Amino acid sequence: MPKHDSLWLKSLRWIQKHLVHTIVVPQDPFADLNLDAFRPLAYVMKTESLSDIAALSEITAKLGLPSPYEPLVANGVIAPRVVCLQGRKPLFGERAGNEPFLECFMRLLAVHKERPELDIQLVPVSLYWGRTPGKEDDTMKAAVFERENPTWLRKCLMILFLGRHNFVQFSNAVSLRYMADEHGTDMGIAHKLARVARVHFRRQRKVMTGPVLPNRQALFHSLLKSESLRKAIQEEAANKKISETQARETAIEYLDEIAADYSDSLVRIAERFLTWLWNKLYSGINIKGAEQVRQLHHDGHEIVYVPCHRSHMDYLLLSYILYYQGMVPPHIAAGINLNFWPAGPMFRRGGAFFIRRSFNGNKLYTAVFREYLDQLFAKGYSVEYFSEGGRSRTGRLLAPKTGMIAMTMNSVLRGIERPVTLVPVYLGYDHVMEVATYHKELSGKKKKKESVWQVFGAIRKLGNFGQGYVNFGEPITLQNFLNERAPNWRTELADDPEQKPSWLTPAVNVLANRVMTNINDAAAASSVTLTSLVLLATDQNALERSLLERQLDLYLTLLKKVPYTTYTSVAEGDGKHLVQQGLELNKFVVCADPLGEIVSIEASQAVSMTYYRNNIIHLFIVPSLIASCLTHNEQIPRQQVVSIVADFYPLLKAELFMGIKDVPAYVNQVLDFFIEQGLVVETDTLTVVPEHTSQLLLLASSVSETLQRYAIIFNLLANRPKMERSELESESHLLAQRLGALHGITAPEFYDKKLYGTLSVKLKELGYLADNQDKSNINRIRDQANSLLRPSVKQTIVASVTAEHTV
């Protein structure tokens, strides 16, 4: 290799500086890969390449990592900073052997034998000039851009045409101290290191580029030859009294309607457009948990992303983030309503496949869709779908639609060998551009059909949207889930493949709820969501700025000292910083008088801001319930607080998809936190410290509307124990409307019929709607709910229920 200060290399670096734009994965190797800045470090690369090392040099200079041109000096031994597995490929003939590179491994290992305290970090580095996966029928393009083993001439062409799409990926370091101690330092170990590194680089390339793309028509013909589709076509012909040729044509039409037509060229163009768009819209996109997903890809998992659905922006945001995190954008299940010009064709070329909202008993369509989904899994494409079935209009997670999850489960049952893993994803925004539309729809206005004019309308409204949040939740590997739910599932299916197992539907329902719970476990507490939570808990949606900042400091400290889960993310900075962020986004207004500043939510925006509060209400609902217990009782034993929370938690869990593993332990941690913060003192009982009552009252207000719902339900059940589920739902909804009208409750979810349906299902499951239920439990929970309400609200509920019962 020429010296790094030679005229040739200086010229090469100058050319690359103007032609090459490099993206680093991960963005912060020190933080994401736990690299130790105080230990010596060497790089291992697949192929010796002057241009690759020049690109790496640019990046290491920016990241503060050792330059690949600087030799590694350890114990008096000088070794190259970069170890390559194979030499450069000449324009003609064969490349040189890898003996010189094995010698490098040997020298590094030998140094560890001489110096027991030495531990060199060996960091694998992969470089990609473009990320085209290639096609099954590639010919000319593959010959020109042979990416894995290019000659210097091909590399020049790649830099010229693909230099703006250069990716440098760092991987977890290998400890040479561990290798030397565990396996020795001879040539055999050097060979083993080289073999492991080659496998690593091969897997990394597949993670970065994805599997080769099929010819679309060839894919259709392949699918039509499958046994299940042939059978479905025959049944369609028999049932509709048409020829098999006509039924086959219908199946092809369905495939054409459904199937994606992924284009790497369009993805590259979209990447540039989206980079411009995000920079225009957002001041930053916060990502948490991407490394675990990258590792799952590397380990050969079939990944299914299951994000929450807040906005049409979700389709773009997750794919963009995955692309920049060194993973292939998934094939996305999009509603057929989005298949309009020009969005539909663009989405399809970006990897979207389209699904009808209802299959309406169409067996042929069902068979075609299922076979297409199976093929995506079989070929190794990652998939994305929204299990809620539509965008949330209230900011809360919707009850899951189980259709896609059931199809994924069935694909596993039909024999996918690789592990299939669902990755829940929390998507959050400081500003959702459809919120005003959601409010109108909840008020009774008919939803507009998606069209190109809506796209233009949305573009006109682009502005400062603050920050976006992408948090990856705890993954669920389906094979492990099935082993947990039905240990003998493989044997059962082998014995009778055609028989639908009795445990399948309940297992799908449990899985769907677990996915939603894991999404909420990964929530992002941001400046907008936290400030909305505080201000909407006040009577006039307004608070003195200093008190608001103090309350936000309390919430931030609570989330950090008693974390909801390890997947949850919390905004950086203090309360003062969060308030300033919210004001800069024009989400809140501030006015000043001689006594100080008051921050508030404008009356016209109050209902819309409940959307952001609802994104994180589950993070604070139990602490809020605890605060309510404390502020409604002068003294209360710790165990009584634990018992009250235990009574309400099953309903909270069903309503808000909560996943607290040990509820009593969590309650005690929150109580200990209140004591540590000086809000509460404990002798034999718990007592609120008078000067901090206002903070706990403000926190307690966040659970008040939830407790009002439960008070309505349990007062009805106590008065009419034999009430049917349908009656309970309708009567609860009617009383909620009356309560809202009398007490000014405007939150949309308070009147949501589906929410009362969810609660009634849970009540039946808990036995509260059974003929032989224990009425004492209902009365106890009714009394607890009533005791935590404002007297005027309690009076309205009790009087309304009593009057209705009398009638």
Swiss-Prot record:
Membrane topology type: Peripheral membrane protein
Any one Gene Ontology molecular-function term assigned to this protein's record: glycerol-3-phosphate O-acyltransferase activity
Pfam families referenced in this protein's UniProt entry, alphabetically: Acyltransferase, GPAT_C
GO biological process annotation, one example: CDP-diacylglycerol biosynthetic process
EC number(s) from the headed UniProt entry: 2.3.1.15
A GO cellular component entry from the record: plasma membrane
Locus of motif HXXXXD motif: 308-313
Reactions listed under catalytic activity: sn-glycerol 3-phosphate + an acyl-CoA = a 1-acyl-sn-glycero-3-phosphate + CoA
Keyword Metal-binding on entry: no
UniProt main location, coarse: membrane
Domain of life according to the entry: Bacteria
Similarity field: Belongs to the GPAT/DAPAT family.
Written domain comment of the UniProt record: The HXXXXD motif is essential for acyltransferase activity and may constitute the binding site for the phosphate moiety of the glycerol-3-phosphate.
Protein's UniProt name: Glycerol-3-phosphate acyltransferase
